[in-house]
Swiss-Prot record:
It comes from Penicillium shearii. GO terms for cellular component: cytoplasm. SUPFAM superfamilies: Clavaminate synthase-like. 2-oxoglutarate binds at T202, R347, R351. The gene is esdpJ. This is Alpha-ketoglutarate-dependent dioxygenase esdpJ. It is an enzyme of class 1 (oxidoreductase).
Amino acid sequence: MGSISQSHKRQPLELQGHLASFKAFDCTPVLGTEFPDAKLAEWLQAPNADDLIRDLAITISQRGVVIFRSQVDLTDELQKTLVQKLGELTGKPSDSTWHIHPLAKYNPTGDSTRHLITTDPKNKPAEDRFRNQAEQPMGVRAAWHTDISYEPNPADYSCLKMVQLPTNGGGKWPQLPILTPVERHGTMANAKCANSIEQSDTLYASSYEVLDKISPAYRKFLETLTATFAQPRYNQSSQEKKSEIHVEPRGSPNNVGSDLSAIHPVVRTNPVTGWKGLYGAGMHTRRFNEVTADESRRLADWLLQMIVENHDLQFRHSWKNPYDVAIWDNRAVFHAGIMDYKGQGHRTGHRYVGVGEQPYLDPESKTRREALGEFN
């Protein structure tokens, strides 16, 4: 897992300037970019759509996460197309498509690749997200993760579109409705959101910057390690719901069965940027394989502490409007939802997750700051 084959040696992709005419700003110096006025549906339907989406993918891989506001015209089908194009245009394996959640057979939505992330009981969620957080032995800090790292071929790009938001803490604002495709073009689609929601935020942390904060000597040690990633909770949830795990291919021929575990390098190379970043940390990381059990526990706690306590590598994204969209590269960031809205309404989002390559480490790859000529 720590080595590299010749097939993995590829040149990083470079921006071609196709997004330069669109207003954008960086959310923090190292992480996050927002396009406040751009419309993803228009980009997908433009004559130069592939050029736009390729530059978008590179931007996401460099900046970690990109934000778009009020994407009322981005249907689920367009969102799904976008996620696949982001990967295809940047070299994902030809047999990688969209991830199918292991619990997809419970409350199927008609599209097994659309993951309904919701706290609304009317949507019959497969899991109680508030209960899951309350049962974490380390509290909310244990929520940090990268998507589907328990799969042999984990996620490249994830796209979350928020369609229902909780009210604010004072409870003064009406509950935002989930719009039908017809209603998206009605009064709600054209209305300004007077109540700027400051709840149900999502935190992102740069896996590039975490690695850059670690000394070169300790980085070399981490680069020799692999970790076992797993998610046993889904098997427990399927039993509680009297359902079953989706054991057929989940977006890749390699992602099959009910074991829901995989071994990956602790430090991996992002093939889009050529930069290496920390990968073995957070919720799904169960064991560092080349060290003792005690060393593994201490290492897991320290790496998570690096993410939690270094605020300069974090970005807190606020979901403010219906149909706000966040797209992130799971090879570049960790993320965690903030469950601070219990009793204030429900949050529902539609997420599509692209499946990428099997993680690898190119020993010749550089950290982000090394590649950009920046040094601490």
